[in-house]
Every structure is written in structure tokens, then in C-alpha cells.
Amino acid sequence: MTPVAVTGMGIAAPNGLGRPTTGRPPWAPRAASAASTRFDPSGYPAQLAGEIPGFRAAEHLPGRLVPQTDRVTRLSLAAADWALADAGVEVAAFDPLDMGVVTASHAGGFEFGQDELQKLLGQGQPVLSAYQSFAWFYAVNSGQISIRHGMKGPSGVVVSDQAGGLDALAQARRLVRKGTPLIVCGAVEPRSAPGAGSPSSPAGGMSDSDEPNRAYLPFDRDGRGYVPGGGRGVVPPLERAEAAPARGAEVYGEAGPLARLPAPHSGRGSTRAHAIRTALDDAGTAPGDIRRVFADGGGRYPNDRAEAEAISEVFGPGRVPVTCPRTMTGRLHSGAAPLDVACALLAMRAGVIPPTVHIDPCPEYDLDLVLYQVRPAALRTALGGARGHGGFNSALVVRAGQ
């Protein structure tokens, strides 16, 4: 098996922005959820959101790109810049065909598209912007990153709801193992326009609470759903583990195989548990080797119970530390799991387990939840999970760098 290394990070999340060395760690125990500021949420079920403060696109991107792109694409471009700089990648040293991009998104550039349609239909603007033809598209982030950095190798986009970020990392890993030297990957979602969240509203998963510290309570008997978050989890370059030291790059860790099960009812017991077991088997890792689990944290009883049962089924009740740092950011949709991966690798380097905040855990779940503050732990292996609407279940093993 060819090891695949994570060599850089560019984080754009409600509680962190930039390279890992430029700010506080993404597990800093604070809530980033607050009332939506980029639109009036009063007519929508979810009143709160995790928004990214302080990002000014003009400080990071050429002026010509700003009017052509949605805000999430600008975040994607900036995060890719940060990740490549963090990895010490000089793109000029690579053949363009040796570099690719894989991202995930389920909504695309919704704010740009919605603004243009409102101008056309409600404000008398006679035509749409020419940039509408691509700015709204869910694949635009892969395209714009590849254009900006001249990356002409294998590329793509993954659409699998909340599981998309892990699926994008897995696809990038496959491409590296097949011979592409460098793949930039990650996931991004908008939360800055009503249309971005509206498709999720009928599913009933979002919290209607207006209390930031009580709105998103996974594994809590008072859980009312999740708080949506906007932004990009992380854009890590992936490359062969042996190639990174050869060019003097620092390795954050290794991305292991991913198990992805799209069928919600496979006839093989718990689909989530089966995804976890498959990821462990493919990584050559025993359940006892996993020292922390980053939970998906749906925030409602049926989802939380199913996830807790799957974790206990594989690892044993209360046998492995479990955390859900998404309680500090909201669920970033497909961007959430890549942020978990970044958080896991940085936390393993720091010798801690990030906390779950605000919750009063329900004893029924029988989980060893890491609560309120970081827990010191010299651990080297973690598992992340994600579940999307329609039964997408993904699990990924990550290991600390040597």
C-alpha cells in the first residue's frame, strides 16, 4: 500500500482562518455560532449559523477575480493558496499535468446565483451577469483553483452531501496512489444566502433554537438538530509520503483508506458500523489501535443514537474517546469532515483531544465523550466519520506524521 501524506493546510472555518501557524488551533473551546448576518433568517427554520468573520477577498485575490466569483470560491482560492504555501509547494517546479484538484460541494456558489436572479426578477436588471454561467456551479471551486495554479492533471468534484468532504479526500488519495504527484483537495459550502440552506430545511435536521450555546447539542437529550455552518474545512495537498521529505516538506500525517457505503439498508447490520469496520480493515488497523473518534454529530436523537450504537458496536461501549468539535463551528456540510481531519492531525501533533462543548451527554449513549476542554493524550491514530442525506456513510482513518 502506497502511503499518502498530508503536507499542508489552509483552513477557512468559523473559528479559524489561514494556515495552522497563523492563528489559534481549530479546537479552541469557543462557540462560533451566532445569528446569521448575511441575510435575514427570520422566515427560515434555522436562525443561527457558523459564519467566517474577517475574511476580505481583496486582501488575498486579484481584483479581477472578485466580481467573477461567489464568496465560497474566494474562500476556496485563498485556502488553496494557504495550503500550498504551508506545504512549501512551488507549483512552477511541477509539470502542470502532475497536479490536480478534487473538491466537494452540494450547493455551489449559491449567493452569487441568488443575487443575480433577484436582480433579474425583482430589481429590473435586464440580463444576468456573464459570470453566472459558471459562478453558481458546484464544480467551480475545482475549476478556479486549477486555473489559478495551472493544475492540469486529474481533477474532479464530489457531491455526496455531508459525506462529500471525506469522499473528496479519498478520491484525491486514489489519484495520488495511481501516480499523480500532487492533488489539492477539500470541501466548501455556502451559508451566506437563503437558498443555500433552504434545500436542507424540509429534512428537518437543522435546529430552530436561537440560543448559540444551546442550539447544537449532539448526544444530548435536549438535542434539536444541528446549526449549519459556512466555509471551507481545509484544503490539504496530498502527495506520496516518500516524495514529501525529498523536497523538504513537513508531513502532518497520513490519510488512510476510506470506506463509503451509499446504501442506507445493506442487510449487513449497522451501515455506519460496517463503514467503520471496512475503513479499519483497509487501513490494516484494529479497533484497539484507534485512540479517538471524530463523530458526525447529527444533533437529533435518532441520528445520535444510531451513531453511538455504531461506535459501541465496533469499539465497545465507552472504550474509545469520542469528540465532536463541530459544536464550535456548526456543521459545515461537506466541509465539516475535512476540518475534522485537520483538527485530528494538529491535535495529535499537540498531544490533545479536542473537546465537544455545551452538551450535557445522555447516559443512554454510553460514550466516552471529551467534554468542554481539551484532554491530554499522546495518540497517533484517529477515525473520522460523516453521513449525508440519502444514506451516504463514510469513514476515514488518519495517522500522525512520523
Curated annotation (Swiss-Prot):
Its EC number is 2.3.1.-. Residues 1-30, 188-222 are annotated as: Disordered. One of its GO terms (biological process) is fatty acid biosynthetic process. PROSITE patterns: KS3_2. One of its GO terms (molecular function) is 3-oxoacyl-[acyl-carrier-protein] synthase activity. Residues 192-205 have a biased composition (Low complexity). SUPFAM superfamilies: Thiolase-like (SSF53901). Residues 1-400 form the Ketosynthase family 3 (KS3) domain. Keywords: Acyltransferase, Antibiotic biosynthesis, Transferase. Pfam families: ketoacyl-synt, Ketoacyl-synt_C. It comes from the Bacteria. Gene3D superfamilies: 3.40.47.10. InterPro entries: Beta-ketoacyl_synthase, Ketoacyl_synth_C, Ketoacyl_synth_N, PKS_Beta-ketoAc_synthase_dom, Thiolase-like. Pathway: Antifungal biosynthesis; monensin biosynthesis. This putative ketoacyl synthase lacks the active site cysteine. Belongs to the thiolase-like superfamily. Beta-ketoacyl-ACP synthases family. This is Putative polyketide beta-ketoacyl synthase 2.
